[in-house]
């Protein structure tokens, strides 16, 4: 496998650390979009405070991400080791199949526990301002957990398509996916709603180093009329961002979050779906 020569030249000039190509360009290059960046893992550089950054080279983009040398991040399982000044070489397996299965299952269960925690915040007895937000966060977390439990590494821009192609062997998994999709409201994806959500998202993420890259991906999905995928992706980005914020910070930006996530205020429907998500989380954690 080759990546553009200018990339290799840039890496030769800029970095002496061990590097690897990760992300969809390494894991699933056949599904990568033109807007997808080349994710470069840098091992052992500023381990206590890795400085991620974006570099534009021509029409393509590199994103550098710092990892500890002994990282067990699932992102690295199908990495392609960089040999400076040469082609890319597929790295020898660093993990046994048993270790990989165990890691995926553990990561999946962890995300489902997170989903259960979020949906459990919703009261069944009274309407609360942040109930629709908790529900969407739970739905995204549960879907991510399902992919991980199925040994599929979630790739946010491709995630809805990953779910479409997932070989579901258990009815409880299929039911959980359908419930989550209903919670997210993907069928509401119209250009009007997406344009409004996109503007709110850019305001929410304006301080992030990668906001231009994320925006270019959304524009790609819009331009290619992948409206459902775009709706899912915007929501995923917002929920990922909110997971790193405390509750007071979330409430300070509640209006923007509501617009970006296309939240509705149907209390009865939120209560019904919260009960179903809670049931699905518990069922999957038992299996």
Q: What role is predicted for each listed range?
A:
Residues 38, 42, 62-64, 177-181:
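Generic preference for hydrophobic/aromatic residues in regular secondary structure cores
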Residues 44-121, 125, 129-132:
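Conserved catalytic core of two-metal-ion nucleotidyltransferases
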Residues 104-287:
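Conserved nucleotidyltransferase catalytic core and NTase-mimicking acidic/glycine-rich helix/loop elements
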Residues 5-47:
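Active-site nucleotide-donor binding segment shared across nucleotidyl transfer reactions
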Residues 23-24, 85, 145:
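Glycine-centered flexibility motif
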Residues 33-35, 52-54, 76-78, 152, ...:
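General "foldedness" signal
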Residues 37-39, 80-82, 156, 165:
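Generic alpha-helical propensity signal that fires on short helical segments
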């Amino acid at each position: 496998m080759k990546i553009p020569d200018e990339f290799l030249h840039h890496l030769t000039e800029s970095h002496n650390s061990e590097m690897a190509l990760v992300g969809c360009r390494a894991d699933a290059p056949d599904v990568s979009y033109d807007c997808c960046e080349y994710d470069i893992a840098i091992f052992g550089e500023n381990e206590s405070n890795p400085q991620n950054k974006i570099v534009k080279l021509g029409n393509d983009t590199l994103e550098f991400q710092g990892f500890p040398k002994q990282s067990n991040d699932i992102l690295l399982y199908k990495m392609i080791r960089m040999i400076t000044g040469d082609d890319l070489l597929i790295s020898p397996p660093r993990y046994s199949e048993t270790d990989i299965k165990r890691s995926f299952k553990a990561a999946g269960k962890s995300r489902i526990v997170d989903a259960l925690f979020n949906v459990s915040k919703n009261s069944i007895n009274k309407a609360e301002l942040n109930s629709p937000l908790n529900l969407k966060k739970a739905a995204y977390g549960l879907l991510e957990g399902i992919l991980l439990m199925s040994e599929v590494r979630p790739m946010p821009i491709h995630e809805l398509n990953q779910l479409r192609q997932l070989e579901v062997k258990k009815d409880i998994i299929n039911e959980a996916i359908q419930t989550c999709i209903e919670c997210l409201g993907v069928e509401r994806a119209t250009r009007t709603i997406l344009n409004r959500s996109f503007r709110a998202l850019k305001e929410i993420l304006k301080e992030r180093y990668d906001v231009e890259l994320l925006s270019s991906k959304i524009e790609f999905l819009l331009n290619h009329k992948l409206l459902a995928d775009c709706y899912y992706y915007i929501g995923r980005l917002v929920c990922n961002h909110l997971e790193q914020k405390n509750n007071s910070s979330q409430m300070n930006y509640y209006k923007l979050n509501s617009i970006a996530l296309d939240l509705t205020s149907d209390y009865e429907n939120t209560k019904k779906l919260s009960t179903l998500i809670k049931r699905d989380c518990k069922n999957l954690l038992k299996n």
